[in-house]
From Swiss-Prot:
This is Protein RecA. It is found in: Cytoplasm. GO terms for cellular component: cytosol. ATP binds at G67, P68, E69, S70, S71, G72, K73, T74. Gene3D superfamilies: P-loop containing nucleotide triphosphate hydrolases. Can catalyze the hydrolysis of ATP in the presence of single-stranded DNA, the ATP-dependent uptake of single-stranded DNA by duplex DNA, and the ATP-dependent hybridization of homologous single-stranded DNAs. It interacts with LexA causing its activation and leading to its autocatalytic cleavage. Belongs to the RecA family. It comes from Hamiltonella defensa subsp. Acyrthosiphon pisum (strain 5AT). Keywords: ATP-binding, Cytoplasm, DNA damage, DNA recombination, DNA repair, DNA-binding, Nucleotide-binding, SOS response. Pfam families: RecA, RecA_C. SUPFAM superfamilies: P-loop containing nucleoside triphosphate hydrolases, RecA protein, C-terminal domain.
Length: 354
């Protein structure tokens, strides 16, 4: 017993010394860590927010979004920026590809007048800008588009054809070590867009890989694989893509879930279409033939008309969104149903299976 008391006193003294030297919060018991309640930002897609398990992308972490060309990578990140700006957050876009379209960004709801944008000359410059913005503590979301375009200075200044084996991977590895801690302290979300390459000579297994080495794979808390799986047509005209996102890595919730949604050209993610599909699936919206009803009231015939109804009635769309998020992100036990708010009760009165 005396030995245990001495150990506790020694531990308390050591903890006090560590906090004195490195600051309060430098060491703590895991259950006391307030950061366990992870703050998130919506991706702009309700289905993807649910698949991520926490309601969006986590603040203070590194996220990688990768996929083939024209699969919706930049569109998804612009939707994240729009969602963050609606919450009053400051966002920055590091445009290493020099391809950001401000007109398209504005159509997706991005406030381009308040979006910080940089078009760096080298990969080192881009990552230093990221680090400076992070250490300022004033920027909430940083997008880097893309890892493949982060060209090391030595490669830019060298001749075409010179060998620079592993140079980009070493640059990314050093940057990850430096950025990870600063992002956590500043509670800044850093999203890297990445491209896909094919490994030569692979006979079995997946020949696809991402650029920039392995460091980003290890340091990323969330990795999203985004693919175009079909075309959306209006008559003979293609107006968008059916998109599928797989959560291939997730440190804040269960991984390996997937989300399916539509990306419409010039509009972005079809959020109202998602609300209709999820509402029908979870018996919040009734479908009889081609007619849709909500709370006993017909709201339109055909999905396109219901989408227009939700656009012109944002309060109904917000109500549906809130109920779906409460039910699918924060499931409750049977004994807790008596404590639900009125919106949640609507769900349970109309749902027999959960």
């Amino acid at each position: 017993m005396i030995r245990d008391e001495n150990k506790q006193k020694a531990l308390a003294a050591a903890l006090a010394q560590i906090e004195k030297q490195f600051g309060k919060g430098s060491i703590m018991r895991l259950g006391e860590d307030r950061s366990m309640d992870v703050e998130t930002i919506s991706t702009g897609s309700l289905s993807l927010d649910i698949a991520l398990g926490a309601g969006g992308l986590p603040m203070g972490r590194i996220v990688e979004i990768y996929g083939p060309e024209s699969s919706g990578k930049t569109t998804l990140t612009l939707q994240v920026i729009a969602a963050a700006q609606r919450e009053g957050k400051v966002c920055a876009f590091i445009d290493a590809e020099h391809a950001l379209d401000p007109v398209y960004a504005k159509k997706l709801g991005v406030d381009i007048d308040n979006l910080l944008c940089s078009q760096p000359d080298t990969g080192e410059q881009a990552l230093e800008i990221c680090d400076s913005l992070t250490r300022s503590g004033a920027v909430d979301v940083i997008i880097v588009d893309s890892v493949a375009a982060l060209v090391p200075k030595a490669e830019i200044e060298g001749e075409i054809g010179d060998s620079h084996m592993g140079l980009a991977a070493r640059m990314m590895s050093q940057a990850m070590r430096k950025l990870a801690g600063n992002l956590k302290n500043a509670n800044t979300l850093l999203i890297f867009i990445n491209q896909i390459r094919m490994k030569i000579g692979v006979m079995f297994g997946n020949p696809e890989t991402t650029t920039g080495g392995n460091a980003l794979k290890f340091y990323a808390s969330v990795r999203l694989d985004i693919r175009r799986v079909g075309a959306i047509k209006e008559g003979e005209m293609v107006i968008g893509n059916d998109t599928r996102v797989k959560v291939v890595k997730n440190k804040i919730a269960a991984p390996f879930k997937q989300a399916d949604f539509q990306i419409l050209y010039g509009e972005g993610i079809n959020t109202h279409g998602e609300l209709i599909d999820l509402g029908v699936k979870h018996q919040l919206v009734e479908k009889a033939g081609s007619w849709y009803s909500y709370n006993g009231t017909k709201i339109g015939q055909g999905k396109s008309n219901v989408t227009e109804y939700l656009k012109t009635n944002p309060s109904i769309a917000a109500e549906l969104d809130k109920i779906l998020r409460n039910r699918l992100l924060n499931p409750v036990c049977e004994k807790d149903k008596t404590d639900l708010d009125p919106l949640d009760k609507i769900y349970h009165e109309n749902s027999t299976a959960f």
